[in-house]
Amino acid sequence: MLPKSLAWWVPVLLLGAWSGAAFAVQTDPIARLVHQKRYGEASSTIEARLARNATDPTALAASVDLRIARGEPDELPQARIDGERCVEANPDSSVCAEALGNVMLAQSRAGGLVAFVRNAHATRDTLERAIRFDPMNYRARVTLMVFYLDAPFFLGGSEVRARELATEARRLDPDLTRLMRAMCAFDEGKLDEAEQHILAADLTEYELVQGSQRELLLTLASAHLDAGRHAQSGRLFQELSRRLPSSEHGPYGLAQVARAQGRLAEAALQLERAAAIAPRPYIYKTLGEVHEARHDRPRAIAAYQAALAGVPPLARREQKQVTAHLAELKRR
C-alpha cells in the first residue's frame, strides 16, 4: 500500500466554498484569487469587505485561507485567531467552521505528531459542523474525508465514514463523488480503482478542486513510472496535460517517461514545454541532466545556471549537485 499522509492532500484541497443547487458550483471571488495565487488582490479585497462589515464570514474565512496558502508558519497563529474570530462572530457559518478546521490542520502539519494528536478531535468536530451547517460545502467534505482516512481510529479516524462521505456527495454531484472515491481507493492502495474513478470524473467546472485531481493523477502516473510501466505512466501524464494544460506536471512527467526509455531528445522537448509553463528550478535541473547526457554542453550549462538562479531555490543538497555538474562542464 502506498503511504498515506495528511500533509500530502491538505495543501491541494479546494480553496473555495460551494453553495446553491445540486450540480451548480459558485465560487467566491476571493477564494478564486487565493487559488490563483493572486495574493495581493485577495488581501485588498478582504480588507475592503471587512471595512464594510468587520464580521463578514466569507472575508474572515478567506483571510484564514490566504495565510495558510502563503505557507509561512509564522502566520498560522494569526490565522488561528482569525478563524476563531470568524466562528465567534458567525457561530452557524459553514465557511467559518471550515476555516478554523483548515488552520488546525495546517498547525498539525507544521507541528508534527504531537500537534496532530492535540488538535485531532477538535479538528474533526469543527469540520463536521461545517458540513452540518452546509451540506454543499464540498471543500469541508473532502477535507474531513482526508482526516478520516489519515487519523488513527482512537483519534477519530474512520475509513468507513470516509466512504460514507463520498457516497453522501453522490446525491449532490457525481463527479465530485468520483474524485472522493478515487482518493479513498488510493488510500487503500487500490490503484486501478483509483485510476478508474479519477478518469471518469469530469471536473472541468471545478477550478478549485483541480489541485486534488492533479496530485492524484500525478501520483498514479509516477507509481506506474517507478514500476517500469511506461505506457500506463505516459497515458496518465498525457491525461494530466490534457485536463490541466496550465500545469507543468504533465509535460514534465512525459519527459521523465521519455528519459527512462532513453528518448533524450523527446525528454528535452517536453522539459522545454514544462519550463515554458512554469520556469521552476527543478525543471531546469532535470533539463541540464538530459542535455548533459546528450553531450550538449552549452545547453546543459545554460539549464544548470537557470536552475541555480530560479525561485523557489533548490534544496541545499540539489544546489551542491548542480554546482558540481556546472563546474565540471565548465572545465571541459
Q: Where on the chain are the PLM-derived regions?
A:
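Structural motif corresponding to the intra-repeat A-B loop/turn of tetratricopeptide repeats
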Residues: 36, 70-73, 107, 151, ...
